[in-house]
Amino acid sequence: MGSTRFFLADLPTRTSESDLQILFQDYGHVEHVDLKRKEQDGATKVIAFVTVQTDDAQYCVNELKWQKLHGEKLRVSLAKESFLDRLKREREENQRREQGEPDESEVRAPSSQLLVQSGQNKRRVFGEDEEIGDDEVAPELLITKKRAANSMHNGRIVIQQEHDVKPLHVIEQHRKAAKQKPDANVSQAEQKRKESLNKMRQGHQQKKSAIQQALSVISVEGSQAKRIKFSDAEEEEASKPVQKAKIQKRDLFENDDDEEEEQIVLPQHKGKKGERLVEMQSKQSIDPRFRITSNFVNEEEEAELEDQPEPEESERKWHMNILEQVVGHAITSANDKDGKSPKNKKMLRFDPAKEGHQKLMRQKQPKEEEEKKEETSSTKAKTADAGNSQASAVSKTAFYIVTDTLRDSLNTRGEGFSLLDMFGSAPEKEVAKRQDQLEKLGHEKILVGKTSANKLGLATLNPFSYDSSDSEDETEVKPKQEQEQEQELEVSKENKAQPAKKSGQKRNKNKLESFFIPRNDPRLKEGAKFFKSTKAVVDHAEYDQVKNRLKLLITKKIAKAKKSLPSKDIKLQRNKKGKN
């Protein structure tokens, strides 16, 4: 007896090793029970490995599947061999082979009773009304009380033999109907039906094969298919012996010339009809079966194409050609430009966005450039006269000096490049000229108009602008303004008296003011006065005058106020009336 290992899955949580030993002890000696618990997702799973000494392990598995443990069915299967058991088994097999002993599988094959025993007498079907005595039933088919509850399956009692896997005894409610033998007429009709179906299939396949053979003859390159030519009976009889003679005279070694002679070349139509055919064929498929032939071209179309007259030249052109032959050269008329009709002429529209149309724009040159051009033209004329007077001409070729030593050449390169040396004077001379100009501007006087004086705050301030005595002060302010105007006129005369330098360029009409503020600028003096914290000097004479004016104003205002008040007599009358 060999030991086999069973695997039990999804066991109830309250199962123990003793329960499994009681369950398996009926089938053989229980060597080892290994119970394992595993927690997964909050639920405990219980599995077990049981090693039992049995001769038929498959029988145990099939019978245990029908039994229950703690109200749940068992899931039993043969466990895989462990690594150590497999090594042990392989070693034992190798030792037996070395000793010359047969394998266990060869020894156990004849001992299996499943193939030897036949199941004809071990399976019996009972009806509902039949009664069976205890003596008639074999002891192998009896069910013990212990396993009676677990032997029910789908409302039937299943009795299993020890060495048989399949159910042996099944009690059913109804007997199975015996198979009736087919009638002779029915079998003949069935045979006829099958024969007709086979004939239909064969005919369909023959049609398919015929179509395939026809297509295989026609090549894709457009080779001509075999064509059937209909002719009279007399012509057929005359042609038959000729074909036989040709067949008989075949040589053993055929030449390529014979194949070329067999090819038939169809005549292609020429002229306009042929062009029409080619145009129609180009629109169709390449397959030669659907090729368009000359029959598709209608006779009416041919007549139309032939009747179309060729375009005659106009009378004017004919006359022009005669004139050209007489004159001897081509004549181009104003109307004919590149053979285009005057209807197709279009007016050229000016579009300033396009680059080509910008050339049509007239570009206005400023006056200064025109004057410069005139000056340059005059200077060029003078230089030309001077050049003619010179006897010897100077060559314009450039010369380069190349030093022998590398040191000298590097020193010359380090000098650098300056535009002042080439086109202008040295910077020191320019600075000296600039300083002289600034000194001259510093001594000149700057004219400031009335509007600019108001902007700068240099206008005379009137402290009594809010007073009604402006009319009295106008007489005093006017002589001051007249004095300022006289000073401006004198300064302008002095500036005019200075001699003006002659120059080729025109003078600007607007007078320029220097960028730098001169020392004698009145704005600087007023600024200094504003920031100085000196005590105000008061003129007593002016103070007395202002005081007298204020007194007069106040007295006038008091007099006006008194006049507007009611008289004393009127007040007294009102008081009396109020008392009454």
Swiss-Prot record:
Residues 4-81 form the RRM domain. Residues 110-120, 386-395 have a biased composition (Polar residues). The modification Phosphoserine is found at S231, S468. GO terms for cellular component: nuclear speck. Residues 254-263, 298-313 have a biased composition (Acidic residues). Residues 89-100, 348-358, 365-377 have a biased composition (Basic and acidic residues). CDD domains: RRM_SF (cd00590). Residues 89-131, 173-211, 254-316, 333-395, 463-520 are annotated as: Disordered. Signal peptide: none annotated. InterPro entries: Nucleotide-bd_a/b_plait_sf, RBD_domain_sf, RRM_dom. The modification Phosphothreonine is found at T475. GO terms for molecular function: mRNA binding; RNA binding. Transmembrane segments: none annotated. SMART domains: RRM. GO terms for biological process: mRNA splicing, via spliceosome. SUPFAM superfamilies: RNA-binding domain, RBD. Keywords: Phosphoprotein, RNA-binding. This is Probable RNA-binding protein CG14230. It comes from Drosophila melanogaster.
